[in-house]
Amino acid sequence: MLCLGIESSCDETGLALVRDGKLVAEKLASQVDVHAVFGGVVPEIASREHLRVLPVLLRELLKEQRLTIDDIDVVSVARGPGLQGCLLMGLSFAKGLVLSCGAKLVGVNHLWAHLTAAGLEQDLQFPSLGLLVSGGHTHIYLIESPLQFTLLGRTLDDAAGEAFDKTAKSLNLPYPGGKLVDDLGRQGVVNKKLFPVPYINNDNLDFSFSGLKTAVANYVNQNSNLRLDTMGIPEEGVEEPAISEERKNMLASFNYTVGRTLEVKVERALKRNRGVKSLIVAGGVAANSVVRSVMTDVAAKFSIPLVLPSMHLCTDNGAMIAYAGYLMASAGCRHDLDLDAIPRGRVIPSDWICEG
C-alpha cells in the first residue's frame, strides 16, 4: 500500500510517501522566511504559499521516485486542527488527486499524527500515555490504538509553545524563537524560584501557561536591558557580558519552569494509568532539550520506555500524516469527498467509514 501524506495545517507544506508502513520519501517547504518579517504567521499569506507550493512538491516527489499519481493507493491529508484557510488548501488538493487517480481519501487528525509519528522509527506499544506539546496544544492522551485516543488533560488557555513564542518575542529574538530560547537557556543558570510553576496545585491533568507568559512579560518589563534593540542576535562583542548572562539565566529558568509543569502533570497521569506500556512525547516543543531530559527521567521513574520521535518528526511534516493515513487505511478506514476541514478550537469527529 502506497500512501501519500499532505500537511498544510499552518506554515509548513509537507508531502511524503509511506509504503507498507515505511517512509519512502518526503518533501518539506518551510514558510519561516516569509513570515519572519511579521513576527508570526499571517494566515492569508500561508494559505497562498500552500496553494503555490503543493503541486511543485508533488511533481518533485513523484519524479524522484519514478512514480505517477496512478501508483498512489491512499491520499491522507491533515484535516485539523489548524488554520482554516491552510487546511482547505491541503484538503482541496487531496480531493483533486483522489478524483484524478481513484485513490482512497483519509482525513487525519493532525494532533494524533504527531503522536503516532514515532512508529516510523520504532514499534509502538499500546496502551501508551501520550504528551503532545506544540505551539497551539498541550494535551495528555491515553492511546489504546492508533485509532483510539482518550483526552485526559488539555491546555485551558495558552499552550507551552505559545509561551515559548511570546518569551522569545518579549526579548526581540528572531522568529521563530523556540530553538533560541532552548539554546541560550542551556548556557544559563537556573533559578527555580524566578517564575511560578503554573497550574499544578490541583488534582487535574489540564495545563495553563497564561500565568507564566504574564510573569515573563512582567520580568522583562522590569528588566528592559534584557531586550535586544532590534529583532536579531547582535554581533559578537556588542552586548555587555553581564546583560548577556542575565538573559541566558532568565531563559534557563523559563525552560525549567515549563519542564517542571509538564513533569508534574505527566507523573500524575502515569500514577492514574498504571497499565500503560510506554510514554510518547511529540510536537514541536518535544524538540526542547529540557523537555526531553525531564521526560526521560519521568519514564525511567515509572520503568517504562520513552518514545521520542526524531527532531525532524517533532515539527509539522508530511511523513507523520502519511503514516497516520497508512494506519487508518490498513484498519479499513476512509472518508468520502465531503470531508471537512476542522479549524483549531473545534472537536475533530471520528467520522471515518470502516470497511471490513
Curated annotation (Swiss-Prot):
Cofactor(s) the protein needs: Fe(2+)
Q: Any idea which positions bind Fe cation?
A: 110, 114, 316
Cofactor descriptive note: Binds 1 Fe(2+) ion per subunit.
Instruction: List its EC numbers.
Output: 2.3.1.234
Q: What is its main location?
A: cytoplasm
Q: Where does substrate bind?
A: 132-136, 165, 178, 182, 288
**GO MF terms, alphabetically ordered:** iron ion binding; N(6)-L-threonylcarbamoyladenine synthase activity
Reaction equation(s) it catalyzes: L-threonylcarbamoyladenylate + adenosine(37) in tRNA = N(6)-L-threonylcarbamoyladenosine(37) in tRNA + AMP + H(+)
BP GO terms, sorted:
tRNA threonylcarbamoyladenosine modification
What HAMAP family is this protein classified in? TsaD
Recorded family membership: Belongs to the KAE1 / TsaD family.
UniProt protein name: tRNA N6-adenosine threonylcarbamoyltransferase
What is the protein's species of origin? Maridesulfovibrio salexigens (strain ATCC 14822 / DSM 2638 / NCIMB 8403 / VKM B-1763)
